[in-house]
Amino acid sequence: MRNKICEELNKSDIGKEVNLCGWVDRRRDHGGVIFIDLRDHSGFMQITINPEDGETLFKQAEILRNETVIMVNGIVNERPKDSINKNIITGELELKVQDLQILNQIKNNLPFPVSVHDYENTKEELRLKYRYLDIRRGKLLENLKTRHKIIKAIRNYLDNSGFTEVETPLLTKSTPEGARDFLVPARLSNGDFFALPQSPQLFKQLLMVGGLDKYYQIAKCFRDEDLRADRQPEFTQLDIEMSFVSEEEIIAFNEKLIKHIWKNVLNINLNEDFPRMSWQEAMDNYGTDRPDTRYGMLLKNLGEILGNIGFNIFTKAIQMGGAIKSITIKNGNSSISNVRIKPGGDIFKVAQEAGAGGLAFIRVKGDELETIGAIKNNLNKDHISNILKITEAEDGDLILLGAGSTKIVNQSLDRVRQYIAKDLNLLENQKAQSQWNFLWITDFPMFEMNEEEKRFEALHHPFCSPKNVKFEDKKELTKKIETSTAYAYDLVLNGLELGGGSLRIHQAEMQKEVLRTVGLTDHQIDEKFGFLIEALEMGAPPHGGIAFGLDRITMLILGVDSIRETIAFPKNQQAKCLLTNAPSNVSKSQLKELDIEITIDE
């Protein structure tokens, strides 16, 4: 049908006859001549139709509506100088049409304009419902092309590094990995269910047992969890696993991979080594294991100074094994009012939503500290001097304080820190926006305490190899459970986790001991992970790997706010596909075939 696409045309095509196909982006009548901007996936080409070209042809062109699908045949001409459009690649050319065929008319008025000339901010619900039109608008189409470039760069790099791409099953066994599984009824085994994989974790480990050595996969994964701007119920991850490697080798290799992606997609050279920070250091200084290091306001520990001044909230926090921490907002006295910090204020609400009861504050005015009487009346000169020294606060600065359990204090001050950074436009200056602050977080704890259930849970997952616990002394794991760290690592970029991985446990007895530690009985271990334990008993090599969130990498490279802008057909924040109305009811006959009966609580 076509022998050229729009943006292939250049001055060497002048005088040549070509066929083009695409959509009518817009039609204009000027002095009896019809000008049509023809749009295809590559770009635009102006086509012209004169009355003297034929009555039938001219009448066809007169009735064309935007988004009509057409094919045109004509001669490429140079545009008159006064009509050159420097905003498009073909802006010096036009096509004088000899023949026009309408391939498809639009039936009704479109739900929103598609042409870039009529582009408007359209509600996301409408964009998701008519996603094919949204793609046709161009911006989303370019996002998908960038995603393709990222995947291509990944495949080229890993293929050249000796990796083998292997597909792992999508219908698998339900195993506890943190989030809820999506379950699929098994018709041939009534009463049993498959689960869609939350990750290919166990299968890629089994591939290492099988001697594959280096594996990767662009893997679809599924998690039935509450959604955020950077979460989807089905998502794509780059999954990598390697045999006979150290933690250092995995980190170094994947750092080179990330640098390769940034160079090939953005033409950005990331020459410096990515810095590293222990999990404990991140929690102490930022209150989170995925810190945004583009700006300051680090958390400072004031427990030793304020824990014994007689202020009840502070005293109780320390007595209960908690913390008193602060962040310092430079020139905060002039930019943040008391109303915003007190109950009902926006900053107070941010802390409250993160679990805090509230915030205390100290305003630095010269050598004096201004705060509530219950705090100020108990501060002596040494207290004031030490507070200023630790917080690095100066005249005009505002100190915000949180007190309570260490987890809540970290969590709330982290959220407040992020909120204030946006509120004060700390990331709006060009330097901050252009920064790619990659950071490896290492030395994660093996376990964390589930306070509600009073039991330990694996912080990453229960297949991470513990540090400094020899196979022969595996009982040390139980004895030192609260201080055990793992060969686990995350890569963080500008406050978002790009990926995470670990060295895996490759000895069966050690794996069983870890699973017992997270509360599984030997019977449950055999029932849920017996196939893995058996494989580890058959000569499993030392191995480890990492998984990167491909949707999130694409989101950051594109500079968009939601991973929905990187996916062709995403779900909304209620995990629904507005295009197909999935999920939806199924027929009674389908349910009967599966021996499933649905009851809905009133």
Curated annotation (Swiss-Prot):
User: Which Pfam families did the record assign?
Assistant: GAD (PF02938), tRNA-synt_2 (PF00152), tRNA_anti-codon (PF01336)
Residue ranges for the region (Aspartate) are 201-204
Enumerate the residues binding L-aspartate: E177, R223, H460, R504
Location in the cell reads: Cytoplasm
State the EC number(s).
6.1.1.23
Mention one GO biological process in which this protein takes part, according to its record: aspartyl-tRNA aminoacylation
Xref: InterPro entries: Aa-tRNA-synt_II, aa-tRNA-synth_II, aa-tRNA-synth_II/BPL/LPL, Asp-tRNA-ligase_1, Asp-tRNA-ligase_1_N, Asp/Asn-tRNA-synth_IIb, AspRS_core, GAD-like_sf
Site description Important for tRNA non-discrimination, residues in chain: H30
Q: Which terms does the record give in the GO molecular function aspect?
A: aspartate-tRNA ligase activity; aspartate-tRNA(Asn) ligase activity; ATP binding; nucleic acid binding
Q: Which GO terms describe its cellular component?
A: cytoplasm
What is the role of this chain?
Aspartyl-tRNA synthetase with relaxed tRNA specificity since it is able to aspartylate not only its cognate tRNA(Asp) but also tRNA(Asn). Reaction proceeds in two steps: L-aspartate is first activated by ATP to form Asp-AMP and then transferred to the acceptor end of tRNA(Asp/Asn).
Q: Output the NCBIfam families linked to this UniProt entry.
A: aspS_bact, PRK00476.1
Annotated HAMAP family: Asp_tRNA_synth_type1
- Please state which protein family the record places this protein in: Belongs to the class-II aminoacyl-tRNA synthetase family. Type 1 subfamily.
Indicate what this protein is called per its UniProt record.
Answer: Aspartate--tRNA(Asp/Asn) ligase
Q: Which organism is it from?
A: Prochlorococcus marinus (strain MIT 9515)
Taxonomic classification:
Bacteria, Bacillati, Cyanobacteriota, Cyanophyceae, Synechococcales
